[in-house]
Amino acid sequence: MSQPKALLRRDGFTFKQFFVAHDRCAMKVGTDGILLGAWAPVAGVKRILDIGSGSGLLALMLAQRTEQHVTIDSVELDAQAANQASENAAESPWAERVQVQCADILAWAPEQTARYDLIVSNPPYYEPGVDCGTPEREQARYTGSLGHPALLAAAANLISEEGFFCVVLPENTGNTFIKTALDIGWFLRLRTDIADTDGKLPHRVLLALSPKEGECFSDRMVIRGPDQRYSEDYTALTQAFYLFM
């Protein structure tokens, strides 16, 4: 049920079915994460992994989109963010399905024996040298903290035979990410280029990679129409989450 705007908490983001506190997280809830959480394919999945979970946004969105038997593991390096993600999960309707680990994915991954049907990540993409303000934001945004080749290799060791590894990245970075992925044996299966409006070039790209070869489906989405309202496509994708949509 929608709440009056005056009653909304200011330390996070209120969705229709859950609240994400993010005041102790370097990276706040934003459009990139919401796009990825609403877009990632979930048909038939049983186990989901969120790499670099931050506030736990993706895990909670995917919990909302999946059946009760689906379990979700979140791995986050920063202790403050991991603690907040755990609290967010505990206060959500899916507390029993979401588990948060405070760990370095590169150390955590080799210890795992189970495989995941879906892995998601909103990974760092800034090169070292860009001022991010705090060490926590640098860790969350610099590729130096988790390089894309290392991320792809870790995901490859954790993905099921027909699973998908989904990310959101800036357009140019995404093209480089695809090349790196193809070079180490991934196949691109889904791609959605995101633009603010029809008249603008895409600025983000959603990618789904798989260890299994198959046809690649590509499309384009604009966030806002000519009247600056959310587009029909963006509304259809995200209206299950946004409180006032």
From Swiss-Prot:
Keyword Zinc: no
GO biological process per UniProt: methylation; tRNA processing
Major localisation: cytoplasm
InterPro entries: DNA_methylase_N6_adenine_CS (IPR002052), SAM-dependent_MTases_sf (IPR029063), Small_mtfrase_dom (IPR007848), tRNA_Adenine-N(6)_MTase (IPR050210), tRNA_adenine-N6_MeTrfase (IPR022882)
Keywords from the UniProt entry: Cytoplasm, Methyltransferase, S-adenosyl-L-methionine, Transferase, tRNA processing
Entry EC no(s): 2.1.1.223
Location in the cell: Cytoplasm
Taxon lineage: Bacteria, Pseudomonadati, Pseudomonadota, Gammaproteobacteria, Enterobacterales
Enzyme class of the recorded protein, top EC level: transferase
Family, per entry: Belongs to the methyltransferase superfamily. tRNA (adenine-N(6)-)-methyltransferase family.
Cellular component terms (Gene Ontology): cytoplasm
Organism field: Enterobacter sp. (strain 638)
Catalytic activity: adenosine(37) in tRNA1(Val) + S-adenosyl-L-methionine = N(6)-methyladenosine(37) in tRNA1(Val) + S-adenosyl-L-homocysteine + H(+)
Role played: Specifically methylates the adenine in position 37 of tRNA(1)(Val) (anticodon cmo5UAC).
Annotated PANTHER family: TRNA1(VAL) (ADENINE(37)-N6)-METHYLTRANSFERASE
A single MF term (Gene Ontology): nucleic acid binding
Keyword Transferase assigned: yes
Name this polypeptide is given: tRNA1(Val) (adenine(37)-N6)-methyltransferase
